[in-house]
Amino acid sequence: MNNIWWQTKGQGNVHLVLLHGWGLNAEVWRCIDEELSSHFTLHLVDLPGFGRSRGFGAMSLADMAEAVLRQAPDKAIWLGWSLGGLVASQIALTHPERVQALVTVASSPCFSARDEWPGIKPDVLAGFQQQLSDDFQRTVERFLALQTMGTETARQDARALKKTVLALPMPEVDVLNGGLEILKTVDLRQPLQNVSMPFLRLYGYLDGLVPRKVVPMLDKLWPHSESYIFAKAAHAPFISHPAEFCRMLVALKQRV
């Protein structure tokens, strides 16, 4: 059985698990891990096949969630960014007793555009899959550039993301492809109507991957959840707005 790379920091009375996005690894949280570990017992995770969690191939969302859960604390706040938001949501659906609160960051229950649903055009995702086999480092870099576009700190935010990717060996092409397949095919809009734990959704107003149009649609579909939009953030609000981001999580902790 392959093990997932997992690091625990801090001694807070509430556990907080952070799940990163596609192509990245847990180093992406270094801008906020000191602050958060002073309030929580913080768990930094490399998703299977990413970063230091080697030896995994492409996985379905359900298998990825189960693999992560095997090493997780009994009960925690689960926070997932982008693709990680789908993994955290899947865990909330299948093991609600282990999720004190669900937080999704710049994530969509359905990343792919559908009828009357804004998202990434399926041919864009298919194009990324095609380009992965040609030049996967450049493809990952293009995807990262999309994530910070439009913010005041776009250049330096993109550099921070690139540094995270380059700090560790690149994931295998089939793992990257499998992640894109999840983004292309998964739709959790209806299932997430049934979660009952506190559910906080955080967005960036300038996000080019998760259009802000989905926010009111999901407010209506999931009236039990709360949403907040960072006015000047794109796809990585914790990098562009770290202090504000951490404050929201500390406030959530008081409520669980």
Swiss-Prot record:
GO BP term, pick one: biotin biosynthetic process
Catalytic activity: 6-carboxyhexanoyl-[ACP] methyl ester + H2O = 6-carboxyhexanoyl-[ACP] + methanol + H(+)
Domain AB hydrolase-1 intervals: 15-242
EC number: 3.1.1.85
Positions annotated as active site in the UniProt record: 82 (nucleophile), 207, 235
Pfam families, sorted: Abhydrolase_1
Localization of this protein: Cytoplasm
Binding annotation for substrate: 22, 82-83, 143-147, 235
GO molecular function: pimelyl-[acyl-carrier protein] methyl ester esterase activity
Gene3D superfamilies xrefs: alpha/beta hydrolase
Annotated family: Belongs to the AB hydrolase superfamily. Carboxylesterase BioH family.
Assembly and oligomerization: Monomer.
Function of the protein: The physiological role of BioH is to remove the methyl group introduced by BioC when the pimeloyl moiety is complete. It allows to synthesize pimeloyl-ACP via the fatty acid synthetic pathway through the hydrolysis of the ester bonds of pimeloyl-ACP esters.
Name of the protein this chain belongs to: Pimeloyl-[acyl-carrier protein] methyl ester esterase
Gene designation per UniProt: bioH
